[in-house]
A protein has these predicted regions:
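Membrane-proximal helix-turn-helix segments that form the acceptor-binding/catalytic region
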Residues: 30-34, 53-56, 60-65, 71, ...
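Conserved donor-binding/catalytic core segment of Leloir-type glycosyltransferases
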Residues: 111, 146-174, 186-188
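Carbohydrate-associated surface elements
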Residues: 116, 136
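Nucleotide-activated donor-binding/catalytic signature segment of Leloir-type glycosyltransferases, i.e.
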Residues: 151, 196-221
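Glycosyltransferase donor-sugar binding loop
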Residues: 157, 184-197, 212
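Nucleotide-sugar-dependent
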Residues: 164, 217-222, 227-248, 259-267
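Conserved acidic donor-binding segment of nucleotide-sugar-dependent glycosyltransferases
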Residues: 271-272, 276-283, 292-298
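A short, well-ordered alpha-helix in the C-terminal region of glycosyltransferases
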Residues: 285, 292, 299-314, 323-326
Length: 331
């Protein structure tokens, strides 16, 4: 797979790894790194959070040619509580973690997705340059919503690992119904078979619809059609060192959002202004957020519009892209 994306020349040689041709993978990687190197310009290799041991030699080769090496870190330890990985995956992440930490020591800088991740890196690698770079998203809103559906629809979209706090949302939804409010819950996404057992909490509830995995097009349509969007998380190291990509995606719809206050979420959005902010693992607060939106639909819609403005300010493709380029130019 190769071609041009905008002004970017790209090639994908990962198929060589999938075919077990690791030496050919190294050979091809070195050829293109040498071909693309321009001694009259700044040359940068941007690497993903985890450094796989088979990629380490190629990154070292790029460094020896004169490339600046920068990492894009979006998480901390992938084996932290709540990730529910298999033994095989845990061993793999343990090994890549060791390789990654070794690689970070001689890198030129890193993009990090949260303040906590920045502080963690600065303690471990003091000379390294850091840039907090949130994820970006396109604007999804097409027309400004004027009113809620009847009955209003709540959406959860994402994975179903313990870290995602789906259990608290389901219990909150049941509590809202118990208090006499009429609403529906739609869920999309997927998790490990053991994670999906959480749906047993609502297996006999006619107002809950689990759609499973959906296409990108259907996901956007569902995000726009639903009235209240939710982003839940547990209070875990994984949650507080990473950043929930679903937040910006939800804000981009212009619909009201209930968001768990983990990581840097509270630095971007304000409670009752651009989202309804709840503490992690708190059923009562999630229920109160749903009830507030149900009882105050016009206020909810305004909060959704304010959230869209936050997305445009902090998570737009243009804004995040400029921050990305500026850091690389000045590294």
């Amino acid at each position: 797979l190769k071609g041009m994306y905008g002004d970017c020349d790209y090639i994908d040689i990962s198929y060589l790894l999938n075919e077990g041709k690791i030496f050919q993978y190294y050979h091809q990687g070195k050829i293109f790194l040498k071909k693309w190197f321009n001694s009259d310009k700044k040359n940068v290799v941007v690497c993903y959070t985890k450094v796989e041991f088979w990629d380490y030699p190629i990154i070292r080769y790029a460094y020896s040619l004169g490339y600046k090496i920068v990492y894009d870190q979006v998480e901390t330890d992938y084996n932290t509580k709540g990730t529910n990985n298999s033994i095989k995956t845990k061993i793999h992440f343990l090994l890549t973690g060791k390789v990654s930490r070794r690689a970070y020591k001689w890198s030129d800088g890193s993009f990090v997705i949260s303040e906590a991740l920045k502080e963690q890196n600065l303690k471990a690698y003091p000379p390294q340059k850091m840039c907090i770079l949130p994820n970006s998203t396109p604007i999804l809103e097409k027309t400004k919503k004027q009113f809620f559906s009847n009955p209003p629809t709540i959406l959860y979209s994402g994975t179903f690992a313990k870290k995602d706090g789906v259990e608290y949302l389901l219990k909150a939804f049941l509590l809202v119904q118990k208090k006499g409010y009429s609403c529906r819950l739609i869920m999309t996404g997927k998790g490990q078979p053991s994670d999906m057992k959480v749906l047993e909490l609502v297996k006999d509830n006619p107002d809950v619809q689990y759609k499973g995995m959906v296409s990108d097009r259907e996901l956007v349509e569902t995000l726009l059609d639903c009235d209240i969007l939710t982003m839940t998380r547990e209070n875990s190291k994984f949650s507080n060192y990473g950043f929930p990509f679903k937040l910006s995606e939800s804000l981009a719809t212009g619909n009201p959002v209930i968001a768990t206050n983990v990581s840097d979420v509270g630095k971007y959005v304000k409670h009752m202004e651009s989202v309804y902010l709840v503490q992690p693992e708190c059923v009562e607060e999630i229920a109160n957020g749903i009830i507030y939106y149900l009882e105050n639909p016009q206020n909810a819609l305004q909060i959704g519009q304010n959230g869209l403005n936050v997305m445009k300010k902090h998570f737009s493709i243009e804004g995040v892209g400029k921050k990305f380029i500026d850091f690389l130019v000045n590294i």
